[in-house]
C-alpha cells in the first residue's frame, strides 16, 4: 500500500493478488466520484461522504479474483488508511454520535477517534444480499475501515426490519458521527497522546 499526501487530501493505492484499488480522500468535496462496481456499496459510500462532508474519488477498484468479499474488505482497509493519514486525532473533538431514522429503522452510531480499533454492532441482517451487495460486506468494510483508521465504532439498532433501511440509516449516522468527531478542538485524552 502506498500513501501520498496532497492538498486537502490523501491518495492511497493498494495492489494485491486479489484486488487493485486507488482512491483519494479529501476534506473538500463531500461526495463520491467514480465507482467500486458494486451499486449498493457505492450508494452507502456516497451516503457516508454526504453526511461526513468528506470527498472520495475512486480511480481504480478492480477485483482480480472476482470475489466481492475481498474487494469490499480491501476498500475498507484503503479508506481507513487514508482517513488515518488525513487527520490528526489530537486536534479534533474525537468523540461523535448520531442517531438517524429512515422509515421504520433507527440506528445510532458512536465514534471515538482513539487510536484503538474496535467495531461492534447489535444487529444482523435477515437476507444474504441487499441489491447487488452481500450483507457480510457491510461488516467486512467496517472492520477494514476501523482497523486501519484506528478508531472505535459502535452501531446500536433501536428499531428496524428492512435491511436496506437499516444499512442506510447506519451509514448516515456513521457519517454524521464522523463529522462531529472531526470538529476542531484541543486534545481530548487524559494520556495526552493518541497513538
From Swiss-Prot:
UniProt xrefs under Pfam families: IGPD
Swiss-Prot/TrEMBL catalytic activity: D-erythro-1-(imidazol-4-yl)glycerol 3-phosphate = 3-(imidazol-4-yl)-2-oxopropyl phosphate + H2O
The enzyme's E.C. designation: 4.2.1.19
Pathway where this protein functions: Amino-acid biosynthesis; L-histidine biosynthesis; L-histidine from 5-phospho-alpha-D-ribose 1-diphosphate: step 6/9
One term of GO molecular function: imidazoleglycerol-phosphate dehydratase activity
Top enzyme category: lyase
Record keywords: Amino-acid biosynthesis, Cytoplasm, Histidine biosynthesis, Lyase
Cellular component terms per the entry's GO annotation: cytoplasm
Annotated protein name in UniProt: Imidazoleglycerol-phosphate dehydratase
Species annotation: Thermotoga neapolitana (strain ATCC 49049 / DSM 4359 / NBRC 107923 / NS-E)
Organismal lineage: Bacteria, Thermotogati, Thermotogota, Thermotogae, Thermotogales
Amino acid at each position: 500500500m502506498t500513501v501520498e499526501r496532497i492538498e486537502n487530501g490523501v491518495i492511497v493505492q493498494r495492489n494485491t493478488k486479489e484486488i487493485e484499488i486507488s482512491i483519494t480522500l479529501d476534506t473538500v468535496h463531500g461526495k463520491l466520484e467514480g465507482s467500486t462496481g458494486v451499486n449498493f456499496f457505492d450508494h452507502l459510500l456516497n451516503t457516508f461522504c454526504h453526511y461526513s462532508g468528506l470527498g472520495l474519488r475512486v480511480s481504480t477498484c478492480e477485483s482480480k479474483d472476482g470475489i466481492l468479499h475481498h474487494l469490499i474488505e480491501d476498500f475498507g482497509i484503503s479508506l481507513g488508511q487514508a482517513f488515518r493519514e488525513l487527520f490528526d486525532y489530537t486536534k479534533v473533538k474525537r468523540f461523535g454520535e448520531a442517531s438517524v431514522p429512515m422509515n421504520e429503522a433507527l440506528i445510532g452510531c458512536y465514534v471515538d477517534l482513539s487510536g484503538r480499533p474496535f467495531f461492534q454492532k447489535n444487529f444482523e441482517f435477515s437476507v444474504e444480499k441487499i441489491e447487488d451487495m452481500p450483507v457480510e460486506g457491510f461488516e467486512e468494510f467496517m472492520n477494514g475501515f476501523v482497523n486501519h483508521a484506528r478508531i472505535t465504532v459502535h452501531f446500536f439498532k433501536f428499531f428496524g426490519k428492512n435491511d436496506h433501511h437499516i444499512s442506510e440509516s447506519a451509514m448516515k449516522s456513521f457519517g454524521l458521527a464522523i463529522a462531529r468527531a472531526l470538529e476542531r478542538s484541543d486534545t481530548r485524552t487524559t494520556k495526552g497522546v493518541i497513538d
